[in-house]
Regions:
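Aromatic "clamp/platform" in nucleotide-sugar-dependent glycosyltransferases that forms part
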Residues: 293
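Nucleotide-activated donor-binding/catalytic signature segment of Leloir-type glycosyltransferases, i.e.
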Residues: 240, 249-272, 276
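Short His-centered aromatic/hydrophobic patch
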Residues: 93-98, 117
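Carbohydrate-associated surface elements
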Residues: 158, 181
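Short alpha-helical donor nucleotide-sugar binding micro-motif in glycosyltransferases
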Residues: 280-285
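Nucleotide-sugar donor phosphate/pyrophosphate-binding loop at the beta->alpha transition
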Residues: 111-114, 122-144, 161
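Short hydrophobic beta-strand element within catalytic cores of glycosyltransferases
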Residues: 287, 310-313, 323, 331
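A conserved mid-protein helix/loop that constitutes part of the nucleotide-sugar donor-binding site
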Residues: 20, 206-210, 215-229, 250
């Protein structure tokens, strides 16, 4: 079967869990079927034995200013992807960035469209801060793609319920739950400390570690608001980059500056690190923190637990389906009881 995977993220341009998911899904599917990945960005080299990779860039002829232009660029890539997948027998889209492309391919070529839901636009109202009026367009792309998909994959049972609540037109039997997974041959404790040393992290001192994008969804602002409650001897290590907007980037920078002035011991790695480097952070963490306010699954917790880190995470979304409270981690209600 010729399968077309549509995604915004694909290595080396990965900034979130959806990109991690698609990387491994494409690798494993390519061993079984004829798979082509259609993604955003610069040209990629197709790995030997792996899927063919075709990259698409937004149309540079689009006019307009940020933030709504970003949503228009997404539609331009969706159109390009839909045109490029001719000959596929099944199209599989990931996130709102590709859902419309999957739907258009379904209509054009009369092929099944499968959509994996990694998050839902109705449950991320803060996206209006990032996209402005483009948030209405991103919501339209997602709704159109999902309501007309032949099958939908939810990454947790809680996410399945969220899909049904957000889009009542979707019949329950169209949704199946397949939890995200990770490659434990890659994510395992790394005894090395060279990466830590290069970023100024002392492996012999306790550390509280956060890894994630700078976005309202990941709750990093709430972690920083609680930072003064952390033992001042502990290092607060933030591996946090790819801010949604300049405004939230400035907000985080201001909070970090104030915390440093009061307690010190804050190490902020402002770039998204490669996977091989990130693994050392949870491998040596005293506590790995996931303060998300919305998380359909939270693949970062799987990665941390595979590195034998103790996880403290919010009890939200699909997190309780992978973090066993009191066994593999501690779950904390987002709102005070």
């Amino acid at each position: 079967m010729r399968v077309a995977l549509l995604t915004r993220e694909y290595p080396p341009e990965v900034y979130g869990g959806a990109g991690v998911h698609v990387e491994y899904l494409a690798r494993e599917l390519a061993a079984l079927e004829d798979v082509t990945v259609h993604c955003w960005g610069g040209d990629r080299q197709s790995a030997e034995g792996g899927p063919e990779v075709v990259a698409h860039r937004p149309w540079n002829a689009l006019a307009g200013s940020a933030p709504h232009r970003a949503a228009l660029e997404t539609v331009s890539v969706d159109l390009a992807m839909a045109a490029a997948v001719e000959g596929a027998e099944l199209v599989h889209s990931h996130t709102w960035y590709a859902n419309l492309g999957g739907h258009l391919a379904k209509l054009l070529y009369d092929i099944p469209h499968v959509a994996t839901v990694h998050s839902l636009e109705p449950l991320r109202p803060w996206k209006a801060e990032q996209l402005g009026g483009g948030y209405a367009l991103s919501s339209f792309c997602e709704r159109t793609g999902l309501e007309n998909a032949d099958a939908i994959v939810a990454v947790s049972n809680e996410s399945r319920q969220d899909i049904l609540a957000s889009y009542p037109a979707i019949e329950p039997e169209r949704i199946m739950v397949i939890h995200n997974g990770i490659d434990t041959a890659e994510y395992r404790p790394d005894p090395g400390t060279d990466v830590l040393a290069s970023y100024g992290v002392d492996p012999d001192r306790p550390s509280v570690v956060f890894v994630g994008r700078i976005t309202r969804q990941k709750g990093v602002t709430h972690l920083l608001d609680a930072a003064l409650e952390i033992d001042p001897e502990a290092q607060l290590v933030l591996c946090a980059g790819a801010p949604d907007t300049p405004e939230i980037a400035a907000e985080i920078a201001g909070k970090v500056e104030r915390i440093r002035a009061e307690r010190g011991n804050v190490i902020w790695l402002e770039q998204m690190l490669p996977k091989t480097e990130v693994i050392q952070l949870p491998s040596h963490a005293t506590v790995f923190v996931c303060p998300s306010i919305y998380e359909p699954l939270g693949i970062v917790n799987l990665e941390a637990m595979a590195c034998e880190a103790a996880v403290v995470a919010t009890r939200t979304g699909g997190i309780p389906e992978v973090v066993d409270d009191g066994v593999t981690g501690v779950l904390v209600p987002f709102e005070p009881p």
